[in-house]
């Protein structure tokens, strides 16, 4: 399934009838089983319905870092992002990709 950023934003955990999605490097993961983390009020709710690649690489929960852009990330931050991606792959199903 393909999602625009706008479509992905509809899966942000605020509508109980919809799953919760988080994208990493353009791949969309269904994180609904982690609702306590990614759902409304959860510690990582700022990632829900978005591509959180930059924020995950920087280990940041700042809204301005929640972005698909990898520009300017250090090698260490890229490695951190890759580690997060591996964790998500092991825990959550991939349901699609973000397209421009």
Curated annotation (Swiss-Prot):
- Spell out the InterPro entries in the cross-references: Cyt_B5-like_heme/steroid-bd, Cyt_B5-like_heme/steroid_sf, MAPR/NEUFC/NENF-like
User: Which residues are modified to N-acetylmethionine?
Assistant: 1
Looking up SMART domains in the UniProt record yields: Cyt-b5 (SM01117)
The record, for SUPFAM superfamilies, names: Cytochrome b5-like heme/steroid binding domain
Q: Which UniProt keywords apply?
A: Acetylation, Lipid-binding, Nucleus, Steroid-binding
Q: What is its main location?
A: nucleus
The subcellular location is: Nucleus
Q: Which residues form the Cytochrome b5 heme-binding domain?
A: 1-82
Domain of life of the source: Eukaryota
Question: Per its UniProt record, what Pfam families does this chain match?
Answer: Cyt-b5 (PF00173)
Query: Disulphide bridges in this chain?
Result: none
> Which GO MF terms does the UniProt record name?
steroid binding
Q: What induces it?
A: Down-regulated by auxin and cytokinin.
User: Record's GO cellular component, any one?
Assistant: vacuole
Which parts of this chain are annotated as the region Sterol-binding? 1-82
Record keyword Nucleus present = yes
Give the domain note. Answer: The cytochrome b5 heme-binding domain lacks the conserved iron-binding His residues at positions 37 and 61.
The similarity comment for this entry is:
Belongs to the cytochrome b5 family. MAPR subfamily.
Q: What is this protein called?
A: Probable steroid-binding protein 3
Q: Which organism is it from?
A: Arabidopsis thaliana (Mouse-ear cress)
């Amino acid at each position: 399934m393909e999602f625009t950023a706008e479509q992905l934003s509809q899966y942000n955990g605020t509508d109980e009838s919809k799953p919760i999605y988080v994208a990493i490097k353009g791949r969309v993961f269904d994180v609904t089983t982690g609702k306590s983390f990614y759902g409304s009020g959860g510690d990582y709710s700022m990632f829900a319905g978005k591509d959180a690649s930059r924020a995950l690489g920087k280990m940041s929960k700042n809204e301005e870092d929640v972005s698909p852009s990898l520009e300017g990330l250090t090698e260490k931050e890229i490695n951190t992002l890759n580690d997060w991606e591996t964790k998500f792959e092991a825990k959550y199903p991939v349901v699609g990709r973000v397209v421009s």
